[in-house]
Structures are given as C-alpha cells and as structure tokens.
C-alpha cells in the first residue's frame, strides 16, 4: 500500500511532497509506538536465572541452523536481495532519469509494484497450494523480467506490468514463507528463527546498493 500511495504522490505532486509526507508518516509511527503499552515480562520463578542475550542468540542459531531447508531458502533469498536492492534503489532511478520520464515514470512504476504487493496478499489468502514454498519460490523470477524491461528500456506500460508481477510474486513468497515457518517451527522457537531469517535474508542488501 505504501509504495502505491508513494507512486501516486510522486507522479502527481513531485518528489519533494513525497519526501515531506514520508517524514510525516515516520513522525506518526513514532508517536504510535511511544504510546504502546507493552506488558511486563513474565516474572522469574524463585531461584531461576534470566537467560542472557548471548545464550538466547546461541539457542536461536541452533534452532535456525538445525533446519537445513530454512537455511537454504534464506541463503538464496540473501542473493535475491543482493541484486534486487541494487536494482530498485540505484539502477532503476538512474535508468528512469536518463532514458525515460524521470520521477513521474518512477512513481507510476512503483505504483504498479505496490498494487502487485496488495494483489499478492489477496491471492495468498485465496490460494491454498499443497506446496506453498514451491509456489512462493516459483514466482520470484518474475523480478528478472522487470529488470530486463527497464534495462532495454521497454515502454512504461510494460514496466508497470512487470513491476505489478514482481509485487505479486514477492508478497506471495512472503505470505507462503511465513505460513511454512509457522507450520513447521515450534511456537517457542519461532521468534528466534524468524530473527535469523530476517537478518540472513537482508544481510547482502547494503552490498547490493553499494555495488
């Protein structure tokens, strides 16, 4: 939803207004988080010691690394983000500026990406595949079509369609991945496994931006 709204704002009002509204949303988010009432942690039983953060990290790593299928997907996803973040954060804006219509075209393209993300979530609610992870991973390569279409570059409507498809694919993958984790990872280990999943998936993203 955010990318869709941002695309509309940038393409109609310009990037300056987009940045201003973005800053405002961060302010609102900060106020909302500040006002959240977080329940106190469960008190320890008499004689029980609180587990150190390093012990929690070790236990989380064991839960994560002992499930090889999770490790393989996270490693693969880390390389996906290595390329995707560099494409979306650097290459796409430069190509749009030099070969197409600048910020307005970028906004329209990102609007398509955002709409695709919404549709991907809707499809994930409707589709009940026997192998959700296979479906999620199978639709990710559509992102390569988006990159190819922009590299040529193809007409804006083609960029819109490929961005839409990428949004659908990425959110289908995310929804099916979360479903698979919650189905096969015990509740008491889920938060720790998810932490290593998030870190591992995004670890190469800054390198993609740098390269």
Regions found by a protein language model. Give the residues of each.
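Helix-loop junctions on the cytosolic side of multi-pass membrane transporters
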Residues: 15-51, 130
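Alpha-helical transmembrane segments and their lipid-water interface positions
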Residues: 6, 29, 33, 204-208
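Short, hydrophobic secondary-structure boundary micro-motifs
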Residues: 36, 42-45, 72-74, 91, ...
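Transmembrane alpha-helix termini and helix-breaking/packing motifs in multi-pass membrane transporters
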Residues: 2-23, 93, 98-100, 207-211
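Mid-bilayer segments of alpha-helical transmembrane spans in multi-pass integral membrane proteins
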Residues: 1-4, 31, 175
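Structural preference for long, well-ordered alpha-helical segments in enzyme cores
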Residues: 4-5, 9, 27, 57, ...
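Juxtamembrane intracellular "pre-TM" segments in multi-pass secondary transporters
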Residues: 39-75
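C-terminal transmembrane bundle of multi-pass solute transporters/carriers
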Residues: 58, 65, 79, 85, ...
């Amino acid at each position: 939803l955010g990318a869709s709204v941002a695309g509309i704002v940038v393409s109609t009002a310009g990037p300056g207004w987009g940045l201003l509204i973005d800053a405002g949303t961060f302010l609102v988010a900060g106020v909302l988080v500040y006002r959240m009432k977080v329940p106190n942690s469960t008190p320890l039983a008499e004689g029980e010691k609180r587990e150190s953060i390093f012990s929690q990290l070790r236990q989380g790593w064991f839960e994560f690394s002992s499930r090889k299928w999770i490790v393989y997907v996270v490693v693969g996803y880390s390389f996906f983000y290595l390329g995707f973040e560099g494409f979306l954060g650097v290459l796409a804006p430069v190509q749009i500026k030099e070969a197409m219509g600048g910020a307005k075209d970028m906004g329209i393209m990102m609007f398509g990406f955002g709409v695709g993300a919404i549709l991907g979530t809707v499809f994930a609610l409707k589709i009940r595949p026997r192998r959700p992870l296979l479906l999620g991973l199978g639709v990710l390569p559509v992102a390569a079509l988006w990159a190819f279409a922009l590299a040529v570059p193809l007409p804006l409507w083609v960029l819109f369609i490929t961005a839409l498809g990428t949004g659908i694919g990425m959110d289908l993958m995310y929804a099916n991945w979360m479903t698979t984790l919650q189905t096969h990872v015990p509740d008491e280990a889920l938060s720790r496994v998810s932490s290593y999943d998030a870190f591992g998936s995004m670890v190469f993203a800054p390198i993609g931006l740098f390269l």
